[in-house]
Amino acid sequence: MNTPHLLSSLSRSQLQDRLFGDGLDLLIPPFAVRVQSRIDVVAEGLACLYADYQIPPFRGTGFSDFHVSLLSCRRWFRPLCAFQLDGVQPFTPLALSEAFALFEWGLNWCVTSHCHQWVTLHAAVLERDGRAVILPAPPGSGKSTLCAALMFRGWRLLSDELTLLEPESGLVMPCPRPVSLKNISIDVIRERAPDCTIGPLAHDTQKGTVA
C-alpha cells in the first residue's frame, strides 16, 4: 500500500513539473483534487498554504473527484485567468493575479454544485471538546475573520467556507482548507497571530484585497 507524502516534500521545480504536466494530485479530505496550471501564483499559493496536505507518492496513482485547471488567457494586454473543471469553464475569467483566489473559489463551486450527499451551508465551522460551532453569515460580514481568530484560541478548523452536514446523523464532515481573508481582516489576523501564514495577496478584486 502506498503511503501518501506531504506536498512540502516536493521542490518548487517538482511541484511546477506536476502542475505543468498531467497535474498535481492533492488530497483535501474528503476530496481528492487534480490541479493543472502554468501560472506562477498558483504554484506559490499551493506551496505556501497546502504544504502540509498529502499527495500520492507516485503520479497518477489515485482517483480524483475534481480535475481542475487554471489557464492563462490573453498573453499581453491585461492577462486573464480561466478556471476549468473537466475542460468546462463555468466562470468569467479574472485577472491573472487572482489565479490562486480563483482556484479556491472554483473549488468551493465544485463542492456546492456536485456534492449533494451532504446538506451544504455557507458557513464556517469549528470544533472544540467534540462539539461543533457553525457560523453562518453572508459574504463580507466577518465570518472568516472570526473563524481565523477562534483557530488561534484553541478551536479546530473544520471548514472556513462550507459546512457539510451528514443528513442522517447531523454530524459535520470536516473539509479544512486555508481561511480566506479580505481587506482589513488580513491585518487584524496578522496582529492577533504574528506567526500565521498568509498566502499570496490578490489586489483590486471584486472583493478588494484577498489573501
Where are these regions (language model features)?
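Glycine-rich, often acidic-flanked micro-motifs
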Residues: 2-48, 62-63, 124-138, 152-211
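Post-Walker A alpha-helix
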Residues: 146-147
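Active-site phosphate-binding and catalytic loops of NTP-dependent enzymes
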Residues: 53-59
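Detector for glycine-centered tight turns/loop "hinges" at secondary-structure junctions
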Residues: 86-87, 117, 169-170
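Conserved glycine(s) of the Walker
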Residues: 141-143
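Short linear motifs in intrinsically disordered
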Residues: 8-18, 58, 68-74, 114-117
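Pre-Walker A adenine-sensing motif
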Residues: 113-128
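Charged, amphipathic alpha-helical linker segments immediately N-terminal to NTP-binding catalytic cores
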Residues: 61-112
